[in-house]
Amino acid sequence: MEPGGARLRLQRTEGLGGERERQPCGDGNTETHRAPDLVQWTRHMEAVKAQLLEQAQGQLRELLDRAMREAIQSYPSQDKPLPPPPPGSLSRTQEPSLGKQKVFIIRKSLLDELMEVQHFRTIYHMFIAGLCVFIISTLAIDFIDEGRLLLEFDLLIFSFGQLPLALVTWVPMFLSTLLAPYQALRLWARGTWTQATGLGCALLAAHAVVLCALPVHVAVEHQLPPASRCVLVFEQVRFLMKSYSFLREAVPGTLRARRGEGIQAPSFSSYLYFLFCPTLIYRETYPRTPYVRWNYVAKNFAQALGCVLYACFILGRLCVPVFANMSREPFSTRALVLSILHATLPGIFMLLLIFFAFLHCWLNAFAEMLRFGDRMFYRDWWNSTSFSNYYRTWNVVVHDWLYSYVYQDGLRLLGARARGVAMLGVFLVSAVAHEYIFCFVLGFFYPVMLILFLVIGGMLNFMMHDQRTGPAWNVLMWTMLFLGQGIQVSLYCQEWYARRHCPLPQATFWGLVTPRSWSCHT
C-alpha cells in the first residue's frame, strides 16, 4: 500500500511540475528548479516515515513481550495449573472463568493517567478551589461573628483524639498477624500431622481472638473518637483478610510439599512484604518498579491530608448546623425528607473524598514506597451504567478478594450452576463487613448501610446489570448514588446527635440496638 501510494503521489507531483513547465509565465525556470526539490523532499519524508514506523513497531513488540513475561512470572509457582474445563461446560448457567486468577502487572492508576490530560486536571483544580472557598467562608464567618481571623479545627482534633492509644493497640494486632499465620504454616509443613494440626489451629485461634477482641475492647473501654476507631477497624479487617489470603494461597502448596512434591514453603520476607503492600491477594512475588519517587509519595500523602481537611470543612459547614438540633424538634416526614435531600451534596462529596484519599492517594503512596508495580486499585467506576459494574470497579482491591475467596470458592463448593447463590454470598459478606465498620466507628448499631447495601444494592445489582448501556443508565446510577449517600449522612447524623441529647438512663441490649432518633424529640 505504501509504495504504490508514494509512487502515485510522486507521479501527481511530477505531473504538476510538468504542467507548470509548460505554462507560459515569466518565472518558468524557477518552477522547473522547484519541482525536483519537491520530489526529493517527498522521497525524504517517505523514508523518514518508514523509519519511524519500523522503530515504533520494534518498541511495541518489546513492550508486549515484556508484559507477557511479567504476567507469566506473576502466576503462583506453588499451585498446579487448573485442568481444562470439560466440553460443554461453558454454558449460560455456568461460570466460564472459574479458574481465573488475579494477575499482577506493572500499570499506573487511572487517575494518574487522566491527570496527564489538561482538561481533567482542570476538574482537579476546581475541587481545590472549592476547598479554598470553604476556608475563606470559614474565616469570613468567624471574623463577622467573633471579630478574629483564625481557623479552628475542633472537629478534626475531636475525631483524632487518643490516636496514640490506637497506634499502640495496632502493635499487638500487627505482631499477631505477622507471627501466628506464618508459624502455623511452618508447623503444618514440618511437624507430625496430629501435633501440627492442633498447634497450628491453636495459634490461629489466638490470632483471631487478638484481632477481633482487642480493638473492640480498647474502643469501648476508652471511648475512642471516630477517626481513631477508623484506624483500628480498618487495620483489623485488613489483617483478617490478608491472613486468610496468605493461608488460602499457601496451605495447598504446603500440603503438597508434605507429600514430597518439592514445593518450597513461602518465605518470611515475602509474607512481611505482603502485609504492607496494597493488595489483599497473596503472591510469593509481585512486579516491582525500579526506584521510588519520593516526591510522588509526599504529594499523595499531602493530598490525603487535604482530603481529611476538606471532609472536616464539609461536615462542619454543611452537616453539623443542620443536624445538631434536629432531634430537639418535633418529628415530621417533611423535615426528614428535606434533611435527606440536603445531605445528598455533602454525602456525594464525602464519597468522592474517601475514594480519592484512600483508594488513590493512600494506596499509591504505599505502593510507591514499596515499589509495588500494579496500581490498578480501581477502574472507571464513574462511567458505570449498571450497579454490577460499579461494585466491580469501585474498589478493585476488595473486589479481587471477594471474587477469589467468596465467589470462586463458593462455585467450587456449590457447583458452577450456583452463580446466584455465590453472588448473594458476596453481597452478604460485604454488607455485614460494611455494617460492622460503621457500627465500630460510630459506636452504635443502626443498620442503614446493611439495608442499603444488602437489600437495595442487591436488587439494583440484578436489575441494573451489564446489559444496561447508554448515558441514561449512567445518569440513573449517579442519581441513586446521590440519594443513597444523602440517606446515609442524614440518618447517621440524626442518630449520632440523638444519642447525645437523649442518653439511656440504664444500658440495656434493646436500648443499645434500637435507633434513638426515632424517639428522641425533646
Curated annotation (Swiss-Prot):
Q: How is it modified after translation?
A: Polyubiquitinated by AMFR/gp78 at Cys-277, leading to its degradation when the lipid levels are low. Association with AMFR/gp78 is mediated via interaction with INSIG1. High concentration of cholesterol and fatty acid results in Cys-277 oxidation, preventing ubiquitination at the same site, resulting in protein stabilization.
**Segments traversing the membrane:** 121-142, 163-188, 197-220, 229-252, 294-326, 344-369, 418-442, 449-464, 471-502
Q: Name one GO molecular function term.
A: sterol O-acyltransferase activity
Q: Which residues lie on this side of the membrane: Cytoplasmic?
A: 1-120, 189-196, 253-293, 370-417, 465-470
Protein name per Swiss-Prot or TrEMBL: Sterol O-acyltransferase 2
Cross-link entry Glycyl cysteine thioester (Cys-Gly) (interchain with G-Cter in ubiquitin), positions: 277
Record's comment describing the protein's domains? Each protomer consists of 9 transmembrane segments, which enclose a cytosolic tunnel and a transmembrane tunnel that converge at the predicted catalytic site: acyl-CoA enters the active site through the cytosolic tunnel, whereas cholesterol enters from the side through the transmembrane tunnel.
**Function, please?**
Catalyzes the formation of fatty acid-cholesterol esters, which are less soluble in membranes than cholesterol. Plays a role in lipoprotein assembly and dietary cholesterol absorption. Utilizes oleoyl-CoA ((9Z)-octadecenoyl-CoA) and linolenoyl-CoA ((9Z,12Z,15Z)-octadecatrienoyl-CoA) as substrates. May provide cholesteryl esters for lipoprotein secretion from hepatocytes and intestinal mucosa.
Outcome of substituting residue 100 to R: In K-null mutant; does not affect ubiquitination and sterol-regulated stabilization
Q: In which tissues is it expressed?
A: Expression seems confined in hepatocytes and enterocytes.
In the UniProt entry, which residues are flagged as the active site?
A: 434
Q: Which organism is it from?
A: Homo sapiens
Q: What class of enzyme is it?
A: transferase
| Pfam families for the chain | MBOAT
Q: Where is this region: Disordered?
A: 1-36, 74-96
Where along the sequence does the record place the motif called FYXDWWN motif?
A: 377-383
Q: Which residues bind cholesterol?
A: 119
The cellular location(s) given in this protein's UniProt record come to: Endoplasmic reticulum membrane
Q: How does it assemble?
A: May form homo- or heterodimers. Interacts with INSIG1; the interaction is direct and promotes association with AMFR/gp78.
Which controlled-vocabulary keywords does the entry list? Acyltransferase, Cholesterol metabolism, Endoplasmic reticulum, Lipid metabolism, Membrane, Oxidation, Steroid metabolism, Sterol metabolism, Thioester bond, Transferase, Transmembrane, Transmembrane helix, Ubl conjugation
Name the protein family. Answer: Belongs to the membrane-bound acyltransferase family. Sterol o-acyltransferase subfamily.
